[in-house]
A protein has these predicted regions:
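N- or domain-start disorder-to-order transition segments that initiate the globular core
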Residues: 1-58
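Accessory "access/gating" subregions that flank catalytic or transport cores
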Residues: 233-354
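Glycine-rich anion/phosphate-binding loop at the beta-strand->alpha-helix junction
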Residues: 152-164, 304, 308-407, 413-414
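Short beta-alpha connecting loops at secondary-structure transitions
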Residues: 11, 209, 245-249, 329-330, ...
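Active-site cavity-forming subdomains of large catalytic enzyme subunits
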Residues: 94-102, 106-253
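Glycine-rich loop at the start of a catalytic domain that most often binds anionic cofactors/ligands
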Residues: 71-86
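Extended C-terminal regions of large enzymes
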Residues: 179, 184-186, 202, 384, ...
């Protein structure tokens, strides 16, 4: 089932090994559930910080600790400049413009920071994670423009600087200086230390967080879409002939079979359907293919769920620090998996939306449905659902654009040092937007059916 409880009914989420469920994630990001740390979480983070001290003492070159960032990795940073280096990256990298992150997007990003860094390989102080936890529990909402970014690199700093009392927080719907808002809430600004600025940016926090919100919503939407499809079958006087288990099992698709079984169960005993069995030899394709379209989308969301849950439980920092003080530098932050699965699921969303729009179009067309034109008394004088069908067509067009793969783009950045680029953030945001539009389309179909 993937989702076993309603996220809004979860009021407290405890972070221990940070292997939490998608429902718990949504509970914090969307419904403001409180976050708690276990003692094991605290000890693990504190131990990780000690490994950094050993690394610095060794004098070894470590990316982003005693070197510059990106192509500036060639420049060594002295120990007395290490704190300034971290402050600089937070202040210099916040360059995105345009649309502001929604509150649940910002909260999802902050929660991902806790869950990733909290695994104990990022060598930050516990105080930094406590600050993020306080932000979540107090409902503080950073002001973060998010357009014009590669990954989240140019808008995550807008959030991170609020931890140190800079930038802006949205208070009562108005962007206000972070220092003033923190004072109002009795929160002391964090003093950033060596390594900590990069740890807040070297990740895929936003794309994983928004991707999980989209997956959660799509799973819930498909439950409603199945029920809605049963109503459509009745309204169009279709039958369940195409859902015969003897036929469906030959397709050998588990999700298709389960969808067909659900439709048969819901439609069992329907007087309308029983009366319709002799109307035609074969129903229109738009009702026959419901289990196949919905089943394929469910398979894709299951695969995306699995991929994003792996990312949720991953360490994607760079560098990472082992208990013996060894610093390992690589690309665990790489977001190819997020990018590809979010792109693919957006295409599945579009496929469901295509079928949904066809159902509305047939329901309001008297020549196809046999029902009053636009489902209203006195058509001509009254317009009924005429324009509602226009809206579903417009939403479908929007979803088609959002389903264009974000992965099909590249550019050179940081003097070629950090190329190719990945558009995981764009892919996740497009998926999220597509799912919200599909939710509205399903609601409109329910109205017409």
């Amino acid at each position: 089932m993937l989702i076993y409880q309603d996220a809004k009914n979860i009021h407290t989420v405890t972070l221990d090994d940070c292997r939490n469920s998608i429902e718990e994630f949504v509970a914090v990001a969307r419904y403001h559930a409180k976050v708690k740390f276990t003692e094991g979480f605290r000890k693990r983070v504190s131990a990780s910080r000690k490994s950094l001290e050993a690394t610095i003492a060794s004098g070894a070159g470590v990316y982003g600790v005693n070197t510059g960032f990106g192509d500036n990795v060639r420049y060594r940073i002295s120990e007395d400049e290490m704190v300034q280096l971290q402050e600089n990256i937070l202040r210099s990298h916040g360059c995105s413009v345009g649309r502001i992150l929604t509150e649940e997007e910002a909260r999802a990003l902050m929660l991902m920071q806790l869950m990733s860094i909290g695994k104990g390989y990022s060598a930050v102080r516990l105080e930094m994670l406590e600050q993020i936890r306080v932000f979540l529990n107090e409902g503080l909402y950073p002001y973060a423009p998010c357009e014009g970014t590669i990954g989240g690199l140019s808008f995550q700093p807008y959030i991170a600087v609020t931890y140190i009392g800079e930038g802006r927080l949205i208070e009562n719907g108005v962007p206000c200086p972070a220092a003033e808002v923190l004072k109002l809430h009795g929160i002391k600004p964090l003093s950033i230390k060596a390594r900590e600025g990069l740890a807040l940016l070297s990740n895929a926090s936003h794309s994983i967080g928004v991707g999980l919100l989209a997956v959660y919503d799509f799973i819930m939407t498909m439950r409603h879409a199945d029920l809605c499809a049963a109503l459509v079958c009745e309204a169009l006087r279709s039958t369940d002939k195409a859902y015969d288990p003897r036929l469906i099992q030959l397709k050998n698709h588990k999700d298709t079979s389960e969808t067909a079984e659900f439709l048969c169960k819901v439609l069992n005993g329907s007087e309308i359907m029983n009366e319709s069995r002799t109307l035609r030899v074969q129903d229109s394709m738009n009702t026959r293919i419901i289990p196949h379209v919905h089943g394929a989308a469910k398979r894709m969301v299951t695969q995306t769920y699995d991929a994003l849950m792996e990312e949720l439980n991953a360490v994607f920092d760079n560098p990472v620090f082992l208990a013996d003080g060894t610093a390992l530098m690589g690309s665990n932050w790489d977001a190819t998996t997020i990018e590809l699965y979010c792109d693919s699921l957006a295409i599945a969303v579009m496929d469901v939306a295509k079928l949904t729009e066809v159902h509305v179009e047939r329901l309001v067309d008297p020549h196809l449905s046999g029902l009053p034109a636009f489902l209203v008394k006195n058509p001509g004088l009254n317009n009924g659902y005429m324009i509602l069908q226009y809206v579903t067509a417009g939403l479908l067009a929007d979803i088609a654009l959002l389903a264009s793969p974000a992965a099909c783009f590249n550019a050179a950045v940081s003097a070629g040092q950090e190329s190719p680029i990945y558009r995981d953030d764009t892919a996740a945001r497009q998926l999220y937007a597509a799912v919200q539009k599909l939710r509205r389309m399903v609601s409109m179909t329910m109205m017409t059916a």
